[in-house]
From Swiss-Prot:
Enzyme class: hydrolase
Molecular function as annotated in GO: 6-phosphogluconolactonase activity
Enzymatic reactions: 6-phospho-D-glucono-1,5-lactone + H2O = 6-phospho-D-gluconate + H(+)
EC number: 3.1.1.31
Keywords: Carbohydrate metabolism, Glucose metabolism, Hydrolase
Name of the protein in question: 6-phosphogluconolactonase
Length: 332
């Protein structure tokens, strides 16, 4: 499998494009100068475009991906608020942007040419909205609102409009601060990392009824940790066996084993990583994890032990200033 890793560095306004080798080694393919502070990124489901959000002029840029994974800018469209997180629906027809400072979610159409257009809907009053996450059925969008201690739920209509789901929200404990999410590949469970208490919630999805239920909450930090909690990102391996969470204060990756059915997590260890790991990701084989240090100006590649989920450091690579986002593309 040929894979490419994209790393967004907003302080130097760059995207570094790396080829990921079979042994986890990275080779630099391209450095893209971006017209703005590039932060969130998402790869189109058909793998032909990369969408990136920029500041301080709030826009989304559409980059065409060639056969090697290199990028060429192909389009630009406005966004109603500073983009904190970008995602698409599973069919690649709509782009969702969450704006933490703007307290809003917007929906933008994606044309047949893969280029994002101007927004067609804006939902306001979502305090501290930190991400938008389409569920595996492509019917419900989850929007964690950190300042509200709840995840708002919306139905996705045929033309891209969002309307309040019949179960309008899922609440966390007070002060948890829900942030980013991941879904189990069996489509029955969702996981949300909470920024302010560095915990993770497990939610069960009932496909037949559409009802949701929180079934577990776990602390992601080592026993006795008494510093400020500041969790950031969450990802699950493609086979659904291991889940990881980053914390920026401790500069740690928390390692969880996932039960066979996806319903329960077990914290098994912690891996020191790059300073202030704002973003990380897992490759499409589930063998490698790439962590970005927002304060170290480096990324680090780890091998994932397929029996335990433990992380073995392989190599570090210098990138741009303040790296915040990592996306991994499988070319074949």
């Amino acid at each position: 499998m040929q894979q490419v890793v994209y790393v967004a560095s907003p302080e130097s306004q760059q995207i570094h494009v790396w080829q990921l080798g079979a042994q986890g080694n990275l080779t630099l393919l391209q450095t893209v100068d971006v017209p703005g502070q590039v932060q969130p990124m998402v790869i189109a489901p058909n793998k032909r475009h990369l969408y990136v959000g920029v500041r301080p002029d709030f826009r989304v840029l559409s980059y065409r991906i060639d056969e090697q994974g290199k990028l060429t800018e192909a389009g630009v469209a406005s966004l109603p608020g500073s983009p904190t997180h970008l995602s698409t629906d599973n069919d690649g027809r709509f782009l969702f942007s969450a704006s933490y400072s703007g307290a809003c979610v917007s929906v933008s159409p994606i044309g047949a040419d893969g280029i994002v257009g101007e927004p067609i809907q804006q939902l306001d009053g979502l305090e501290g909205c930190h991400s938008t996450n389409i569920d595996p059925t492509n019917r419900v969008v989850w929007a964690p609102c950190l300042k509200e201690d709840r995840i708002r739920l919306y139905d996705l209509g045929a033309t891209g409009e969002l309307s309040v789901h019949r179960q309008a929200e899922m609440t966390t404990v007070a002060g948890a601060g829900p942030r980013h999410m991941a879904f189990h590949p069996n489509q029955r469970f969702a996981y949300c990392v909470n920024e302010l208490d560095s915990s993770v919630d497990v939610y069960q999805l009932d496909a037949a009824s559409g009802e949701l239920e929180k079934v577990q909450t776990l602390d992601a930090m080592p026993a006795g940790f008494n510093d400020t909690r500041w969790a950031a990102d969450i990802h699950i391996t493609p086979n659904g066996r291991f889940l990881y969470i980053s914390d920026r204060t401790a500069s740690l990756l928390s390692i969880f084993q996932v039960s066979e059915d996806g319903s329960a997590l077990t914290l098994t260890g912690h891996q020191p990583t790059e300073t202030q790991p704002r973003g990380f990701n897992i490759d499409n084989t589930g063998e490698f994890l790439i962590s970005a240090g927002q304060k170290s100006q480096h990324i680090e590649v780890y091998h994932i032990d397929q029996n335990t989920g433990d992380l073995q450091p392989l190599a570090r690579y210098a990138v741009g200033q303040g790296p915040m986002w990592v996306s991994v593309l499988a070319l074949d």
